[in-house]
Amino acid sequence: MTSYDSGDNFASAAMMRILALGLKQEGIHFDVPSSSGAHVPIHEKRKVLDEVITRLGPVSLLRVSDAVRKLPPEPLAQALLKAKTIEDLHRRWTRMEAFTHGRHRLHFEAKERGKYVLHHQASSGSVLPSQAETLLVVGVLTNLMEIVSSAPVTVATLRGQVWRQNETWFPPAVPTDDRRVILEVGDVSAAPRQAFASAGEPTEITARIRSLLAADPLRRWYLSEVAEELCLSQRSLQRHLAKQATTFSRLIADTRLQCAAKLLCEEPGRGLAEVGFLSGYSDQAHFTRSFSQHVGLSPQSYRNNV
């Protein structure tokens, strides 16, 4: 394994951008590792996180995580925040981890309605995450959950110590050896659904489906959901697609392919793993295999030759 969080860890770079922005908003100067690209060396990341805890205390990492709300628009954050539910957000986060092949994983366990146990753990054969790494991850995920659910999230340890309540962070006990916390979502504000106008010609319907899929490639789309958006029955939608000599699964595959091709051509600095993740593929192998099969070139060869 290299000195990076395994290969193309765009997620680690995003964490450093959040940290840099949060410290800046607090008026605190820190030399945060450059994070404009996809790679952040592990030793640099851990060094700056440990320095933040030493100088400012553990609660500082929780507070700076609030900067995710003011992060300039970027594809990774937008892909996560398009989640429709907390469960959808967790699924997207897990898919992101599949692409980064990082040393750590987040295990989500749903309890009763609105309550989840989050365990920040090591991948097979890796060292445990540091206290600082766990605090930053918990802080960022809590903010994402509050944005997606439009509700406050209470964070507490299994022993009952409260870390966050009423949108305020409190100093965590030191050390946080267990690396498990309980996140409880308050009353969720259900956003009204906006459906497309009633269906028209098959070509128009197909264009609308492509528009829906392209707006959120990471979403686990179901035919029933798209039919509802278009004010159609599933059977009617299938008939419309058949008239266009296509299928729902074919449209999903085409949308992923077009999204990936666009990113490969227009954003040469974006890593291949991030391109695959943002385009909706399940993991790096799925991205490479599917892209090569349909285009005749690997993603890297396509980028080099087009």
Model segments located where?
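Broad structural signal for hydrophobic residues in well-ordered alpha-helices, predominantly aliphatic
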Residues: 52, 65, 93-96, 145, ...
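N-terminal low-complexity or simple alpha-helical regulatory segments
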Residues: 1-107
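Residue-level recognition of alpha-helical structural elements
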Residues: 8-12, 129-130, 219
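DNA-contacting interfaces and partner/effector-binding or oligomerization modules
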Residues: 78-183
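Short, contiguous, pocket-lining structural segments
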Residues: 10-11, 40, 133, 201, ...
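A broad structural signal for alpha-helix termini and local helix breaks/kinks
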Residues: 26, 56, 145-149, 230, ...
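Conserved short hydrophobic patches within well-ordered secondary structure
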Residues: 17-22, 139-143, 248
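Extended mid-to-C-terminal alpha-helical interaction segments
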Residues: 152, 159-306
